[in-house]
Amino acid sequence: MKTLELTGAALNWAVAQCEGKNSVASCYYEDNVPLWLDEAPHPVWEPSSNWAQGGAIIEREGISLYLYSDSEWNSHLGGKEYCATTPLIAAMRCYVASKLGDEVEVPEELLDCVYE
């Protein structure tokens, strides 16, 4: 899957791979909301929507972010540039691309587990 198209559980999984979190998982639904967990009962890993998780990566990696237009954020890291509707999604796509490349093999079960 193209890194540019990663969202939700697939993007969070790819970030986990970059972070060395190898115990992947699963997608399950709670109150009709798809969630991806590292291993229960740990907190949900959502760096593409959780500033405490994604913000730490942005700061550590030195990912640059700026508002490109009213509805688009751009991110830069190591010669990679990615955009998205939120700064966290843009930054996490950029991070994944810098570590794993412009295409990522995502487990099939995570492809239907999309949220943004």
Language-model region placement:
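Glycine-rich anion-binding surface patch
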Residues: 1-116
